[in-house]
Amino acid sequence: MATEHQPGTRYRETFARAAQDPAEFWLEQARTLDWHTPPTRGLDYDGQTSWKWFPDGQLNISYQALDRWVQAGRGEQPAVIWDSAMTDQQVTYTYAQMLDKVSRFAAALRAHGVGHGDRVLIYMPMIPEALIAMLAVARLGAIHVVTFGGFAPREVATRLDDAEAKAVIAANGGLEPSRTIRYLPNVAEAIELAEHKPQVVFIKQRPEVDDTIDAFNTEWLDFDEQLAAHEPVEAVPMAATDPLYLLHTSGTTSKPKAVIRDHGGYAAAAAWSLPNIYNVDAGEVMFVASDVGWVVGHTYIVYAPLVSGATTVVYEGKPVGTPDAGAFWRVVSDHGAKMIFSAPTAYRAIRAADPAGEHWQRYDMSALETVFSAGERLDEDTYHWLAKVTGKPVVDHWWQTETGWPIVANLRGLDPMPLKPGSPSVPVPGYRVSVVNPLGEPVGHGTEGNIVVELPLPPGAMVGLYGEPERFYSSYMAAFPGYYETGDTGYIDEDGYVFVLGRSDDVINVAGHRLSTGTLESVIAEHPTVAEAAVIGVADEIKGQKPVAYVVLTADADVDAEQLRAELVAKVRHDFGAVAAFRDVDIVSALPKTRSGKILRRTMRSIVEGEDVSAPATIDEPAVLDSFAQQATRWEA
C-alpha cells in the first residue's frame, strides 16, 4: 500500500519520458550544451551490450566547461576556489583565468607530442593544477587517466601499463596533517616498474614539499614553466562518442578495471544532474569534499560544476584534524556553499569528535541548503545526527564509479520528495532500476534481491572497459541478460523508494540464512556510544559463518566493554532477530578504510582469520591496519 512518501507528479512524468523514449529525452537535454556539430540522433543501441549517445554530434567538454562561459560574459565569475587547510591558503580562479591556464597548458602538452586519443596519467593532490591538467588533456582530445595521489608505485605502474600513457602529469607531493606524501619517488619508481615508459613527465613543484625535479630526473619538465612558455590553444572538436577519460575501479581483482567515459554523454548527464539532483545552478557555489582521483571528484568537483557555470570548492584537508571537527562547516561558511557532499565515513568522523555538534554553531551556515552523502550506505544513526545538528535536509544518494553520476537520488531541484532514512530515494530519470532474484526474475515490493539497471545505461555512464570488451560483458551483463548488474543487494518499497543494503559480497551466510552486514551495522550504529561499526562474517565450525562486530566509540563514550557487548547483543536480537546468532563485539580505535572512505572488510576478515595480509594500495592510513590487527580478536577456523 502506497504512503504519503510517493514521489511527485513532476518526477513521475520526467522519469516516464526518459524511460519511454530515452533517445528523444536525452537529445532534448543535450540542446542545452554548446555543440560544434549538434547531434540529430540521441542513441544508437545494438540491443545488447553496445550503445552510443549522440553518435553524430561533436563537442569538447573543455570548451563546455570554460570557453562558453567566458563568451557568455561570465569570465570574471569564480570558477574554482582552492581552500587548503594544509597551507592556510584560499585562492580563487575565475573562468577567464582557468581558460587561460588550461589553454596554455594544453599548448605545452601539444608541443611535447600529446594529441587526440593519447592517454595521459595524472597523479596529483587536491590542488588547482589537477583540474587544469584534466581540462587541458581533454581540450586536445587526449584521454586523462587520473590516479589517486599517494597511490603506491606499483599501483601507478599498473595504470601506466594498462593505459600505455604517453605523458605523466604529477606534483612533487601531497600534504597530510601528520606527514608529507612524497610523490616524486613514487613517480620515479612507477616508471621504472612499468613496462610502458611515458615520453614526457610534467611536475608541479609545490614550495611546501622539499623534493625537486633536479634531484630525480633532469629531463622532467616544470609544470608552471611550461604553462607560462606557451600561447593558448583552442579546444579540438571531438566526436561525442570519443573517450574523455579512463578511471580505474578499486575492485577486488588483481587488475583494476578501466572505465571509459565519453565527451558528449558525460557532458549532457553532468549538465542535467547538477540542477535537477543537487539544485545548483550557474553562479552558485558547491562544496564536494572528495578527491579528483575518485569518480565523485571527476563529476562533481570538476566537470558538472564547470559545465553548468557554477563555482566549485577544491578542498585540501580533512573532516577532522585540520584543525578540528568544524573544518567542513568552516569551508561552507567561508565560501557561501549552497550544498556540501561527502561520504558517511567523513560525517561519522565529525560526529565521533564532536558528538554535540558544537562546531556547527560557530559558523554562519545560512547559505547551506542541503547536506548530501554518498560513497557507502548512510546508516540511520548518522543520518539522524546530521539532521539534528544541521537542521538541513540530509540526502543520501547512490551510484558507482561505473555509472559516473547518481542511479538513485532525491531530486532536490526537479521535484524534492519526502526523505526516508535508510533509502537514497528513487531511481533517477534515465536509470530503469529493478530488483531480481538469482534467476533474473523481478521480485515484489519489499523483497530483497540483486539491484539491476535495464540496458542501455544512460548518458554519462561507462561505455566500456578500456581494452577489455569481454570483461565488460562478463563483469556487468552476463549474470542478468538485458541488465547492468550493480553488484549491490536491496529492495524497492511500495512507494518506489530503493533501499540499498550492501554489496552482494557483503552478505554473510549464518546457518543457511543470508544476512546483510549493512543492516546489522545500522542496528549496531544506533547505540549512543557507537560512532562507527563494521560487521564481517568469520568462519564458524557449526554455522559456517558468524557475524562479528568491530565498533569505534564516540569521543565522549564511557562504557564497560562487556556491558556494551551485552547491550549490542540484546539490541541486535531485538531489532534484527535471533537468526543473526550475534554475540561477538570488539572495540577498536579505528576501522581500516580506503582513501575514498570504504571499509576494508575483506582485509579485516583476513586479519582476524589469521591470514598473512599486506596493506592494500587503496588504504588511507596504513597505521590503522596495524592497530586493528593488535586490537581485534583472532577467529581462526
What spans do the regions from the language model cover?
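Conserved pre-ATP/AMP-binding loop-to-beta segment of ANL
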Residues: E76-P78, V201-K204, D214-H248, K255, ...
